[in-house]
Amino acid sequence: CMLYTLPGIPCIYYGDEAGLTGGRDPFNRGCYPWGSEDTDLIGFHKMLGAFRKDAEVLSDGGFYPLSSALGCVAYLRYKAGERRVACIANKNPDTIDYVLNSDMQNMHVFCGGENIGGSVSIPPETACILTD
């Protein structure tokens, strides 16, 4: 989620979109797994790519950091007259409930979390995207 919502151009390493893993040099990437790709993961990347293409704020909007403590990184992308996009990444081994700022209360979850009355529940080692 962060790659698609941070400023700049998303760079997906060869095969990551299909679930390809690697090892140490010189085996850091094997052959593409034609016919055995992780189709759910490919669909997730396609969904994020379409979302980024549709959200102009992710191409040329501002960046405002919200939090970077206790294994949680959160930021807001904004542009006058455009919808806002927030990303909250949970690096913790446990689910977190991220309390939304008062001006973010009306944002809804696009992917990766669940709205719970003024906060967002984010599973372990995942990220959540919110939008207006």
Predicted features and spans:
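Aromatic- and carboxylate-lined catalytic core of secreted/periplasmic carbohydrate-active enzymes
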Residues: 32-66
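Carbohydrate-binding surface patches
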Residues: 66-102
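C-terminal beta-strand-rich structural cap/linker in extracellular carbohydrate-active enzymes
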Residues: 117-132
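Solvent-exposed beta-hairpin/edge-strand motifs
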Residues: 102-113
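A conserved amphipathic helix/loop scaffold
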Residues: 60, 88-89, 115
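Hydrophobic, well-ordered secondary-structure elements that form the walls
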Residues: 3, 15, 48, 88-90, ...
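Aromatic/acidic polysaccharide-binding cleft in carbohydrate-active enzymes
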Residues: 1-39
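Short glycine-biased active-site loop of nucleotidyltransferases that positions the nucleotide triphosphate
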Residues: 21-25, 76-77, 120
